[in-house]
Design a protein with these regions (language model features):
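Structural recognition of the beta-strand scaffold that forms the well-ordered cores
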Residues: 1, 28-34, 91-95, 110, ...
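Acidic/histidine-rich catalytic neighborhood of metal-dependent amide-processing enzymes
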Residues: 1-52, 56, 81
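Sec-exported extracytoplasmic/periplasmic mature domains
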Residues: 18-22, 58-66, 86-89, 132-137
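Short catalytic/ligand-gating loop segments at beta-alpha or beta-beta junctions
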Residues: 43, 66-79
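His/Asp/Glu-rich mid-to-C-terminal helical/loop segments that flank catalytic regions of hydrolases
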Residues: 102-138
Length: 138
């Protein structure tokens, strides 16, 4: 049996990043939004993101009045943005990694409890506001 890790799931992002590199696309920033629909929105920005984009995310959240919904994380999270970072593109991961029954549990992630009834239109709207503000400032 072959082993599997979370990094094995990045085939699509690796392919897209490689195509963008080959086409010499001028990318100002890759903004990944992952699991940002939770009712108790707590966006985390991991350390392995472009520093300027980390700062931009905080500034954008401040400008939209959503600063309490986003914070920096000193750890590394391997997610689809990593494929772009690896090829030299500026990239950021906006991820809510505290998705679950109780804050910090993350007990819904990749389970049968990860269902549409857990989504919040308000959380999606908040994330959208922040990202639009980021894009406008790029």
């Amino acid at each position: 049996m072959l082993g599997y890790s979370e990094r094995d799931g990045f085939h699509g992002s690796k392919r897209l990043a490689k195509a963008m590199k080959q086409q010499q696309k001028k990318i100002k920033g890759v903004i990944l939004m992952d699991m940002v629909g939770d009712r108790d929105l707590r966006i985390t920005v991991p350390r392995n993101c472009t520093a300027d984009l980390r700062l931009l995310a905080l500034e954008a959240a401040e400008a939209t009045g959503d600063r309490t919904k986003i914070g920096l994380f000193d750890g590394i999270i391997y997610d689809d943005h990593q494929a772009f970072l690896d090829l030299g593109f500026p990239a950021i991961d906006l991820i809510d990694f505290y998705f679950g029954n109780r804050p910090g549990e993350n007990d819904y992630w990749h389970t049968t409890k990860d269902t549409l009834d857990k989504l919040s239109a308000d959380s999606l709207l908040t994330t959208g506001r922040i990202v639009i503000e980021m894009i406008n400032r790029l």
